[in-house]
């Protein structure tokens, strides 16, 4: 083995990612033309993650359920409640921050030609339709609700299959997991390409006009990540939550920040869950499920941008309406489903609570896309790191009870 390969093997993945991050920033500042040419490194990495994630989830969930023995305990229900509690708590934090530090928008006159859902019923209907999607179509389009539905269905059916069949499914799961490990090893190069290209192409000039709005958004996400989530985890495990919280932010949040897709970060979260020694039958289901419904960052984005529009238009907001907005934002956030920028398209739905017409609401969406370089990255980092955090908290709480 060459000295370079030995050094790479000795250096931790997080350290390598940090080196790639700093190198990407330096290249974008000093040689932006070269940085733009290296954008393909980031594209290849994100594409590889997105390609492997649907197959990984399908095979892993199916294998987990097919090989599940009667009497083995899983902790999906408490994790599901943690996901819902965390998303609602994030929406409440966003409402409080927007009331304390109201933001004003300079709404653009250009109309965004985007298709946004018409109501909560439509969001729930879309989720139901996603669940009964054709399995091949679900895999092709990374429809994780449909993938989960078919994986669970096939897994339950294969529980009655022969040991040989279940062994083949388990071997497939191990094979796909090995491929994922190889892809994740290229994360430092991918992060290097993503950071250098993003800074070289967009720069930070476009964000300067929205500093207050960004401060409220990022502030809410940091508060949820460093205060609210640790409180929820402490309530579950009854000990210092910060070692676990910081590990999840460092090993899951950093990668998610740059891939900007909860779906693409599923392999990273599964690898971290394995590293933490969590219950495999639990995390193989809860992590892909979290990428679909655990959307604390999306709830914050929907709430803050909606209340910014409300404040700009001078519409009064009473407490019951604010509480209703928190509930609506939490429900709508579940429809964001790991799509980069997906939460922005749900803003018109929340704006409709205040009678804001679609034309103005879509201008707010346009503002969201302008600040999306930071907003979407921070949102995904919070969403994805919380998936593994709550899974770990629930698993550790159950282990303490059974000890």
From Swiss-Prot:
Stretches that traverse the bilayer: 14-34, 45-65, 79-99, 138-158, 175-195, 214-234, 295-315, 327-347, 353-373
GO molecular-function term, one example from the UniProt record: neutral L-amino acid:sodium symporter activity
Pfam family, one: SDF
Classification via InterPro entries: Na-dicarboxylate_symporter, Na:dicarbo_symporter_sf, Ser_Thr_transp_SstT
Gene3D superfamilies (UniProt xref): Sodium:dicarboxylate symporter (1.10.3860.10)
Main subcellular localisation: membrane
Gene Ontology, cellular component aspect: plasma membrane
Subcellular location: Cell inner membrane
Function field: Involved in the import of serine and threonine into the cell, with the concomitant import of sodium (symport system).
Entry protein name: Serine/threonine transporter SstT
């Amino acid at each position: 083995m060459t000295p370079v390969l030995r050094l790479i093997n000795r250096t931790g993945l997080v350290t390598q990612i940090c080196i790639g991050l700093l190198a990407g920033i330096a290249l974008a500042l000093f040689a932006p033309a070269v940085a733009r040419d290296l954008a393909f490194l980031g594209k290849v990495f994100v594409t590889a993650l997105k390609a492997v994630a649907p197959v990984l989830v399908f095979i892993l969930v199916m294998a987990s359920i097919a090989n599940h023995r009667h009497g083995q305990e899983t902790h999906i229900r408490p994790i599901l409640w943690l996901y819902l509690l965390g998303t609602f708590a994030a929406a409440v934090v966003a409402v409080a921050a927007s009331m304390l530090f109201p933001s004003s928008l300079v709404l653009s006159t250009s109309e965004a030609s985007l298709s946004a859902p018409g109501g909560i019923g439509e969001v729930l209907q879309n989720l139901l339709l996603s669940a009964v999607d054709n399995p091949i179509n679900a895999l092709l389009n990374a429809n994780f609700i449909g993938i989960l539905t078919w994986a669970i269905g096939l897994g339950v059916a294969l529980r009655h299959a022969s040991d040989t069949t279940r062994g083949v499914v388990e071997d497939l799961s191990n094979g796909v997991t090995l491929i994922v490990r190889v892809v994740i090893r290229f994360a430092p190069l991918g992060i290097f390409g993503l950071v250098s290209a993003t800074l070289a192409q967009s720069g930070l000039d476009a964000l300067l006009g929205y500093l207050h709005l960004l401060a409220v958004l990022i502030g809410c996400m940091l508060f949820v990540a460093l205060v609210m989530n640790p409180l929820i985890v402490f309530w579950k495990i009854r000990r210092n939550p910060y070692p676990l919280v910081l590990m999840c932010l460092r090993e899951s949040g950093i990668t998610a920040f740059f891939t900007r897709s909860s779906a693409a970060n599923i392999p990273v979260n599964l690898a971290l869950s394995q590293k933490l020694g969590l219950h495999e039958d639990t995390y193989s289901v809860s992590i892909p499920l979290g990428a679909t419904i655990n959307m604390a960052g999306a709830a914050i984005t929907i709430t803050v941008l909606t209340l910014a529009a409300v404040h700009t238009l001078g519409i009064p907001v009473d407490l019951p309406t604010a509480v209703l907005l928190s509930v609506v934002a939490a429900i709508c956030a579940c429809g964001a489903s790991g799509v980069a920028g997906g939460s922005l398209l749900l803003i018109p739905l929340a704006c409709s609570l205040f009678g804001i017409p679609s034309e103005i609401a879509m201008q707010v969406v346009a503002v969201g896309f302008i600040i999306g370089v930071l907003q979407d990255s921070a949102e995904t980092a919070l969403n994805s790191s919380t998936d593994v955090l709550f899974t770990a908290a629930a698993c550790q709480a159950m282990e303490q009870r059974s000890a």
